[in-house]
C-alpha cells in the first residue's frame, strides 16, 4: 500500500491517576512510551473486563501512546451537539493527527513515521470506555445547554476513537510535524 501523509495537530501528556492531559509543543518518546505520560511503561496491569488476562496480571504495554484523527474529534463533537470541538487532550489522547481518512480503522502493524525520525507502530483500536463517556457527560454540554447522557460519547465515537500502540524508534516530535503512515500489507518474506 502506498503511504498516506498527515500532520500532527496537537500533543498531550497525562499525569498518573487523571484523565486530564496537558497540551505540549513537543513530545519526547522513549522506548517505553511518552516521557511524563501516565501510560508510559514496558508493562501494565491487565484490566478486568477488556483484557485476555485476569485483572491485575502484569502484561506487555500495548498502550504506550494514543492517537485520534483531528477530523474525527470534530465529527464526534458535532454529533454530540457541543459548542466547540473536543481536543485530543479532552478525551485523554496523546496525539491528534489530521489528513488521514479512516484513521481509526488502520490495522495492527501500521507504521507512523514522523519527519524527525520517531517511529510508532499501531497495536490496536482504542475503544471508547464508560469512564471517559461519564467524564465527557460531567464536563460538557450541548449548544442548547442540554446535558449529555452517560453513554453519548461511547455511541458517537464507537468507530472513530483512535488507536494505541508502541514506540519503535524514540525521539522528539513537534506540533506541525508531518507523519507518513504506511500499512504493512505483506510480510517481508512474502514480498517479491
Where are these regions (language model features)?
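Short, charged beta-turn/beta-strand-edge "cap" motif at the junction between a beta-strand
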Residues: 118-120, 126, 180-189
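Short alpha-helix capping/helix-loop boundary micro-motifs
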Residues: 97-99, 162-171
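Electropositive, beta-rich accessory/interaction domains or terminal extensions
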Residues: 1-115, 124, 190-192
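A short, acidic, flexible beta-alpha connecting loop/helix-capping segment that sits on the rim
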Residues: 168-172, 184-187
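Glycine-rich active-site loops that engage anionic ligands at enzyme catalytic sites
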Residues: 106-167
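Short, well-ordered loop/turn sites that connect or cap secondary structure elements
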Residues: 106, 114, 172-175, 179
Amino acid at each position: 500500500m502506498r503511504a498516506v501523509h498527515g500532520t500532527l495537530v496537537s500533543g498531550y501528556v497525562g499525569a498518573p491517576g487523571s484523565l486530564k492531559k496537558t497540551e505540549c509543543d513537543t513530545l519526547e518518546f522513549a522506548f517505553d512510551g511518552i516521557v511524563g505520560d501516565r501510560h508510559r511503561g514496558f508493562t501494565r496491569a491487565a484490566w478486568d473486563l477488556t483484557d485476555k488476562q485476569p485483572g491485575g496480571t502484569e502484561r506487555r504495554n500495548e498502550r504506550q501512546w494514543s492517537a485520534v484523527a483531528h477530523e474525527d474529534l470534530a465529527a464526534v463533537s458535532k454529533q454530540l451537539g457541543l459548542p466547540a470541538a473536543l481536543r485530543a487532550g479532552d478525551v485523554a489522547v496523546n496525539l491528534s493527527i489530521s489528513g488521514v481518512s479512516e484513521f481509526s480503522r488502520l490495522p495492527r502493524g501500521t507504521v507512523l513515521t514522523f519527519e524527525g525520525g520517531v517511529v510508532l507502530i499501531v497495536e490496536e483500536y482504542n475503544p471508547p470506555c464508560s469512564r471517559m463517556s461519564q467524564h465527557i457527560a460531567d464536563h460538557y454540554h450541548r449548544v442548547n445547554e442540554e446535558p449529555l447522557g452517560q453513554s453519548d460519547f461511547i455511541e458517537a465515537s464507537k468507530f472513530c476513537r483512535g488507536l494505541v500502540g508502541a514506540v519503535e524508534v524514540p525521539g522528539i516530535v513537534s506540533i506541525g510535524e508531518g507523519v507518513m503512515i504506511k500499512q504493512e500489507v505483506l510480510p517481508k518474506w512474502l514480498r517479491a
